Curated annotation (Swiss-Prot):
PROSITE patterns: HSP70_1, HSP70_2, HSP70_3. The modification Phosphothreonine is found at T199. It comes from Buchnera aphidicola subsp. Acyrthosiphon pisum (strain APS). This is Chaperone protein DnaK. GO terms for molecular function: ATP binding; ATP-dependent protein folding chaperone; unfolded protein binding.
Length: 637
């Protein structure tokens, strides 16, 4: 069995880790960084950039530079959270044919899983470059509070990237694995507070050790899948835009280029204010009017930032109370508090969490890497490389069906350990009913319409009978990824209908296959593009070198040879403007052949210069006179 890599597919940053022997190792990407910005750019030339290269060109290409895509994955266009994002994102979020939120890139509609797959491909390539082998399997993490549709969409992204997703695990659970693996003996109850770029989770986890086997059992989980660092950035951006409008009377919101520059600076200022009390946001030439260019220079203090985002931090405290209540624990039962996610570096976040739990959070867990490390550990468990670790995760939300009167009847309650299976008998609501519709729901509300609809199916062929007579057995089966399978069976006839809940919108099998094929085709195109760039660079270097030699040796070479070389140079320069790799290679060889005489002259000149330098050094040595000296001994006293 090959390596199963662990991937933290984050809203702001992503990270990949592997098990190296019995130790997890976070891998550096091609740019030498251990985390990769979850940013994807589609350039005018048709190139797809991921990570830092995408981030670097965001200012000049705001409409086609996509970030925080995880906030849209598995979501409907009409969702309130999506409608909020439409107002603040520089790129174009559109409604797809199935009602999902998609993105319009260069007049082409793209699904969030298809875009996220580009980040996963980079993570896969990072692992392949390090290991020197093809990677086909991965464990990918998701926020604990992700619903079924969001989990399915994440699995789809993995497939499009060419990965078989062996397991989807919750981010706080992964962080607990990273924390608990090398800790000493004894049982501990920990709280994992995970505030990332776009999502917030809290999980209460019990780590037990029996006969050298560690069991990580999730007791309860809660959260908010639309609360994170991006919201903190938005508050600061809005403040800066408002201040600038007060000073200059210009609203920067109408200028995507200015907003992209402002986003970058706001993120930087927020990070700086975690260690400094004050910072300057200084953006010269941010815009212009009839009076000339305008510059933005605003001082931001830590206190000001805290006043802008305090309500967001307080929003994260309520789920802590619910999670503790669901686990049947109080704050005094918590041994350790672990902080995960880049936003937890903010001092105010740390102090509010410390105030709630009555203890300082642990500082020995890397908030950016812990989740990927935990995913790698789970990958090791699945491949058999890691022994004596058992992970018991939970389903974050209750699952049930709609029953008479539009009520949701739960079959599996939230925080039930998975995998799990539960059956319940239901009956018909009307006389002589020959079919029932099973409407599957996820959520905590009593009214069906207030919960998320996961899908519905019909069970036909029920024998006509008075209402309440037929017996329909409905079974809910949740697998280790937290994905639901539902069956309904007529006890009398034995007739059964089964479905794996696919998000009622989501990508269908045909769409996923098409995206997988597109990704494979693009991979080939990307390889060809990379080879073209390398050949082009080789050609550029040769042109520069020959021009330099031609200039230095213009008096030593015959006029005819000079003309031939110049002609070959012109041909290569023209070829470099095109996209034909073989044409560039042909002209490189041609120039090398024709300029061989010039290279020979240049080499002889270099040898002569070297010889002259040596002779000059020897002459200097001949003129040196050795000093004479006489040793004088001290007279004896």
């Amino acid at each position: 069995m090959g390596k199963i890599i662990g991937i933290d597919l984050g809203t702001t940053n992503s990270c990949v880790a592997i098990m190296d022997g019995n130790k997890p190792r976070v891998l550096e990407n091609a740019e030498g960084d251990r985390t990769t910005p979850s940013i994807i750019a589609y350039t005018q030339e048709g190139e797809v950039l991921v990570g830092q290269p995408a981030k670097r060109q965001a200012i000049t290409n705001p409409k086609n530079t996509l970030f925080a895509i995880k906030r849209l994955i598995g979501r409907k266009f009409k969702d309130d959270e999506v409608q909020r994002d439409i107002k603040i994102m520089p790129y174009n979020i559109v409604n797809s044919d199935n009602g999902d939120a998609w993105i319009d890139v260069k007049k082409q509609k793209m699904a969030p899983p298809q875009i996220s797959a580009e980040v996963l491909k980079k993570m896969k390539k990072t692992a392949e470059d390090y290991l020197g082998e093809t990677i086909k399997e991965a464990v990918i993490t998701v926020p604990a509070y992700f619903n079924d549709a969001q989990r399915q969409a994440t699995k789809d992204a993995g497939r499009i990237a060419g990965l078989e997703v062996k397991r989807i695990i919750n981010e706080p659970t992964a962080a607990a694995l990273a924390y608990g693996l090398d800790k000493g003996k004894g049982n501990r109850t920990i709280a994992v507070y995970d505030l990332g770029g776009g999502t917030f989770d809290i999980s209460i986890i019990e780590i037990d050790e029996v006969d050298k086997e560690k069991t990580f059992e999730v007791l309860a989980t809660n959260g908010d899948t639309h609360l994170g660092g991006e919201d903190f950035d938005s508050r600061l951006i809005n403040y800066l835009v408002t201040e600038f409008k007060k000073e200059q009377g210009i609203d920067l919101r109408n200028d995507p280029l200015s907003m992209q520059r402002l986003k970058e600076s706001a993120e930087k200022a927020k990070i700086e204010l975690s260690s400094a009390q004050q910072t300057d946001v200084n953006l010269p030439y941010i815009t212009a009017d009839s009076n000339g260019p305008k510059h933005l220079n605003i001082k931001v203090t830590r206190a000001k930032l805290e006043s802008l985002v305090e309500d967001l931090i307080l929003r994260s405290i309520e789920p802590l109370k619910v999670a503790l209540k669901d686990a049947g624990l109080s704050v005094t039962d918590i041994n350790d508090v672990i902080l995960v996610g880049g936003q937890t570096r903010m001092p105010m976040v740390q102090s509010k969490v410390a105030d709630f739990f009555g203890k300082e959070p642990r500082k020995d867990v890397n908030p950016d890497e812990a989740v990927a490390v935990g995913a790698a550990v789970q990958g090791g468990v699945l491949s058999g490389d890691v022994k004596d670790v058992l992970l018991l995760d939970v389903t974050p939300l209750s699952l049930g069906i709609e029953t008479m009167g539009g009520i949701m009847t739960s079959l599996i309650n939230k925080n039930t350990t998975i995998p799990t299976k539960h059956s319940q008998i239901f009956s018909t609501a009307e006389d002589n009913q020959s079919a029932v519709t099973i409407h599957v729901l996820q959520g905590e509300r009593k009214r069906s319409s207030d919960n998320k609809s996961l899908g519905q199916f019909n069970l036909d062929g029920i024998n006509p009978a008075p209402r309440g007579t037929a017996q329909i057995e409905v079974t809910f089966d949740i697998d280790s990824d937290g994905i639901l399978h539902v069956s309904a069976k007529d006890k009398k006839t034995g007739k059964e209908q089964k479905i794996t809940i696919k998000a009622s919108s989501g990508l269908n099998e045909e769409e996923i296959k098409k995206m997988v094929n597109d990704a494979e085709a693009n991979s080939e195109a990307d390889q060809k593009f990379e080879e073209l760039i390398q050949t082009r660079n080789q050609g550029d270097q040769l042109v520069h070198s020959i021009k330099k030699q031609l200039n230095e040796n213009k008096n030593s070479i015959e006029e005819e040879s000079k003309k031939d070389i110049q002609l070959a140079l012109n041909k290569l320069e023209n070829a470099l403007k095109g996209e034909d790799k073989s044409d560039i290679e042909k002209n490189i060889q041609n120039l090398l052949k024709i300029s061989s005489k010039l290279t020979e002259i240049n080499q002889k000149k270099s040898e002569k210069d070297q010889k002259d330098n040596n002779m000059s050094a020897n002459k200097k040595d001949e003129n040196v006179v050795d000093a004479e000296f006489e040793e004088i001994k001290d007279p004896k006293k």
